[in-house]
Amino acid sequence: MNDFDTFRHEAKAALRVALQWFLLAVPMGLLCGFLGTLFHLAVEHATELRAAQPWLLFLLPAAGLLITALYKVTKCEGVGTNNVLRAVQSGEPVSILLVPAIFLGTVLTHLCGGSAGREGAALQMGGSIGWNLGTLLRLKDHDRRTATISGMAAFFSALFGTPLAAACFAMMVEDVGLTFTAAFVPAFTSALIAYGCSLAFGIAPTHFALTAPELNVRTALLVILLGVACAAVSRLFCYTLHFMEHTVPKLLPNPWVRVFAGGVLVIGFSYLFGVGRYNGAGMSVIVAAVEQGQALPWDFLCKIFLTALTLACGFKGGEVVPSFFVGATFGCVVGPLLGLPAEFAAAVGLVSIFCGATNALIPSILLGFELFSGAGLELIALGCGICYMLSGHHGLYSSQTFVTNKLRSEYMSHKWRVKVKKAEE
């Protein structure tokens, strides 16, 4: 075979694969975009209803029992984001029943005042749809991995309106230092289509108005200091979530008792800390921190504790938006002490702690670009880099593996990766 024949053969194969993924990405984006928009609206209306009817908080224990029953009926007990990540890593099956289970469970949690996010739920639903669609189409294991990544990206994009960050996050979060770049085009295509669906239904993308300080040596040094502090908070956030996740079930092994007691405790702590401020995702507090420079000194600690308690007791949602809350409020409070504007420090904190908690450096920088329209991107990237480097080889997801070292340009040994995973467990 001469060079021309080789070129022609490779070109035909590439076009065939590109067409295959385009034909899959379009329906994937439409389906995840529609369901993601529906999920966004459901959580939004649940939040508005709870704000208008504060007594709904007292139904949280009953909502917890319903969620536990729902997961038992669908046989999804113990299934979460880690299972979806393992589906990408090793092809572990993900039940399609996870979609209605996490959808309804998250809406009930937000309706009745549980302190949780929504992006973790989006990753689970998108990953479940992608994996099962790939199975239905009888795709090979490596292609089903791409389908799972595309579903995750599409759902994430539909909720936040950040298609570029969504695609890269879905590609990179499973294995730190390893990126399946072949998944970019289908994942980004699905994310763009899902984003378009959300716009068509009137969902505004998540954007913040931000004024960045001048880029100079002094400002860069201050951002470095903030990044160091964010790394410590990121470690605290992840440690608290994992500690509660493993301790609470040992103290209350019965899931029915655990979720009911957890609901009662969340009610009590909500009244102790301030009803409404730490319930739900807390987007209003995030907006106040980033756009108005307003936050209470203890906001980030209260959110860490209530989110860890909510999720450990069996309520559903995600950890991503709580990481935004923790980062924005922490940055808003600490930034002025260092000499940074409160609003800008909140933005740096938001993206940096998300980065440290998820170990997704490039997606975090892209998220900062899309959330803040590129304002202060160099400084935000600097804060992310420092937090990423110092946050350690652990994060929100225990199934996440570290292929490369975060401190040196070297591969991690298999023994160390296993050690890290066992430490998380």
Describe the residue ranges of each PLM region.
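Alpha-helical transmembrane segments and immediately membrane-proximal extracytoplasmic
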Residues: 1-425
